[in-house]
Amino acid sequence: MHSTTPISSLFSFTSPAVKRLLGWKQGDEEEKWAEKAVDSLVKKLKKKKGAMDELERALSCPGQPSKCVTIPRSLDGRLQVSHRKGLPHVIYCRVWRWPDLQSHHELKPLECCEFPFGSKQKEVCINPYHYRRVETPVLPPVLVPRHSEYNPQLSLLAKFRSASLHSEPLMPHNATYPDSFQQPPCSALPPSPSHAFSQSPCTASYPHSPGSPSEPESPYQHSVDTPPLPYHATEASETQSGQPVDATADRHVVLSIPNGDFRPVCYEEPQHWCSVAYYELNNRVGETFQASSRSVLIDGFTDPSNNRNRFCLGLLSNVNRNSTIENTRRHIGKGVHLYYVGGEVYAECVSDSSIFVQSRNCNYQHGFHPATVCKIPSGCSLKVFNNQLFAQLLAQSVHHGFEVVYELTKMCTIRMSFVKGWGAEYHRQDVTSTPCWIEIHLHGPLQWLDKVLTQMGSPHNPISSVS
């Protein structure tokens, strides 16, 4: 009796070098894909003397120092393996260290690495032990005073209201990434389809975008790296000359907090880190999408498998849909990829058309007006929320009253339109005038705010639709 052998297997051959390297593979999924990725790498490394030996040394002795193992950088920075494109250091970190790795945002190079992916050199290091995985920082609890020493006359509410109502333009300012982002990032990535602007604050102040006025300042104008000021407050946000008041100048205005007389309120990660609602003009369409995966794709296609990592807008129907909306929906395409990594939220435009984002947290970090709408071109990504920044602002705000803390709820909502933008440079004044847009609610920060506000008790001035 003869066994039947597929014709393809007669001609398939795995080299001994590939077999050895696959011995260190992590996880048991996508065996064929991993084999092809390693085979592609071996062909490149065999052209370099000692490269294969160095890689095997790194994989067999992960605790020992090892040298860079490099391959040439492609034009777009990516590597294609079996009809899938990805960044090379991400691919090989996934093969040999972290099978669940989703994005380059989750990786940081070690100091010993001479050719990290972000260094714009002709060679890229793919040694998986020259990268570390970003850890989610532990946020310190917010200390809420047990006894209210709050003086409404010294509240920063006027400053927040100034930015939120009186000074907010009828049409938001616009900024385009990366042109308007003049502050150089601490660790910039090269321009590529997976280019991410993952800036962390380097200096105490950020430049305004070319279209942003120098005043009024954002109500959140504090350095991220500077510890919160002592409990000082000013009566108004600006002097008669229109310049922002230096909070450190009025050192005689002190809100006394008895030492140790406070309740700590801790941050907790919710089951669903965000929810996404889809709108067409001012009409809500479909059910709210609850995101449990840290990597979520929002696209214009249909997905009959009901993948929990995808929110497919192509499935949603609307009897009031006009031709402009229909045409816009056809251009959403691959849409936007949302990542929640290390306490930070990134939005990556994977559509062929730009996306437009309004995030107060992002605008604060870059010194823009709070209502600024940022254009993210195809192939670029932007950090749209930073938990550590939010934690610091919340810790500062609890000493200025209920209303000031409540204002931070606006930071926990991100609005994003597809294909069509809005603001001063567009004929659409408001996001509700754009054909297709989404509203993202960040559950962790919102629930943290809710717990802090509950501890603070009722506001001195009741919150209303006009407050």
Curated annotation (Swiss-Prot):
Record-listed Zn(2+) binding positions: 68, 113, 125, 130
Main location per the UniProt record: cytoplasm
A cellular component annotation (GO) from this entry: cytosol
Gene Ontology molecular function: DNA-binding transcription factor activity; DNA-binding transcription factor activity, RNA polymerase II-specific; I-SMAD binding; metal ion binding; RNA polymerase II cis-regulatory region sequence-specific DNA binding
GO biological process: anatomical structure morphogenesis; BMP signaling pathway; cell differentiation; cellular response to BMP stimulus; intracellular iron ion homeostasis; osteoblast differentiation; positive regulation of transcription by RNA polymerase II; regulation of transcription by RNA polymerase II
Cross-referenced PROSITE patterns: MH1, MH2
Subcellular location: Cytoplasm; Nucleus
Result when mutating residue 43 to E: In PPH2; affects SMAD-mediated signaling
Post-translational modification: Phosphorylated on serine by BMP (bone morphogenetic proteins) type 1 receptor kinase.
Region (Disordered): 174-246
Keywords noted in UniProt: Cytoplasm, Disease variant, DNA-binding, Metal-binding, Nucleus, Phosphoprotein, Transcription, Transcription regulation, Zinc
Pfam hit, one: MH2
Tissue expression summary: Expressed in heart, brain, placenta, lung, skeletal muscle, prostate, testis, ovary and small intestine. Also expressed in fetal brain, lung and kidney.
SUPFAM superfamilies documented for this protein: SMAD MH1 domain (SSF56366), SMAD/FHA domain (SSF49879)
Keyword Transcription regulation carried by entry: yes
Biased composition (Low complexity): 205-220
Record domain MH2: where: 273-467
PANTHER family per UniProt: MOTHERS AGAINST DECAPENTAPLEGIC HOMOLOG 9, SMAD
Family (UniProt): Belongs to the dwarfin/SMAD family.
Disease / disorder: Pulmonary hypertension, primary, 2: A rare disorder characterized by plexiform lesions of proliferating endothelial cells in pulmonary arterioles. The lesions lead to elevated pulmonary arterial pression, right ventricular failure, and death. The disease can occur from infancy throughout life and it has a mean age at onset of 36 years. Penetrance is reduced. Although familial pulmonary hypertension is rare, cases secondary to known etiologies are more common and include those associated with the appetite-suppressant drugs.
Name used for this protein in its record: Mothers against decapentaplegic homolog 9
Native source species: Homo sapiens (Human)
Taxonomic lineage of the native organism: Eukaryota, Metazoa, Chordata, Craniata, Vertebrata
